[in-house]
């Protein structure tokens, strides 16, 4: 009821509904002044009771013919103590859009009827749970709510009222149904605001993604170069050159920009080469220049050790490289000592034949 009173406020303060006052006032006045256009709650409730097959006095056609005189004194006294329903002024409907559903006196009186039925539960026969659910609102009343703008079409209730309406008022009722069931215009539609916006504003997905990082570097460098050119053109006062640079800045990248992209890619690859590897590569699979040089140095050492093994005896029996080198050093020193001894012996040697020739 609070929401209904808020909707039918005779003095609307919001400026959003003032734009709907452009509808003809005669049409709205005809809908307000016509008492037969409103919903009859007694007939509507009796139709739902009979359609659901409720047994007893409530489901019989005599339910409509019962007069308030046949009710008990307790129910009459309780109905007398109830506050009267609020009277709606015709001017309260002027601030509403033409497609918004109207509420008549019959629906406002349905509250008193529901309370009336709730008091007399001990005088009537027990009813099913469907009657309790439908006493508050019909089953399919909120099935045709529009998901785009939030306005309900209320087509089921309009169909019930159109079946019960007399031929004399059929024209006005059809106009009312057509206005209420018409899809809302573009002025009445509410803009949808997404609650969760997709997080797609990041320039790249991850810091370690090389492709996105290269694209980001190239775009930043291209923008910096273009901004520098624009600044130089503004200082020199060349208006035509500035316009051309501006069009180039807004257009697709040209050959110069692609060359700068290639330069940025080369710099990025060199940066990757200078950064040490986090994971150790297998032997023979490393591509770093230092790794390649180390591998070449080790291959040279192994080749020289093989040559030493061929020259130095008993060197192949050693398993340790340091022991092999010590053995080779000792062998070389021994050879040097032998060489020195032989030289000394040759110097001190005197041949007898030479002495005879000299005499």
Curated annotation (Swiss-Prot):
Keywords: DNA-binding, Nucleus, Phosphoprotein, Transcription, Transcription regulation
Gene3D superfamilies, per database record: Helix-loop-helix DNA-binding domain
Positions of the bHLH domain: 285-335
Residue list for modification Phosphoserine: 60
Subcellular location, record wording: Nucleus
Residue span of region Disordered: 161-186
Gene Ontology BP terms: cellular response to nitrogen levels; photoperiodism, flowering; regulation of DNA-templated transcription; regulation of gene expression; regulation of nitrogen utilization; regulation of photoperiodism, flowering
A Gene Ontology cellular-component term: cytoplasm
SMART domains, sorted: HLH
Biased composition (Polar residues): 167-184
Molecular-function GO terms, alphabetical: cis-regulatory region sequence-specific DNA binding; DNA-binding transcription factor activity; protein dimerization activity
InterPro entries recorded: bHLH95_bHLH (IPR045239), bHLH_dom (IPR011598), HLH_DNA-bd_sf (IPR036638), IND-like (IPR045843)
PANTHER family assigned: TRANSCRIPTION FACTOR BHLH130, TRANSCRIPTION FACTOR BHLH83-RELATED
Subunit structure: Homodimer.
UniProt-recorded name of the protein: Transcription factor bHLH130
Native species: Arabidopsis thaliana
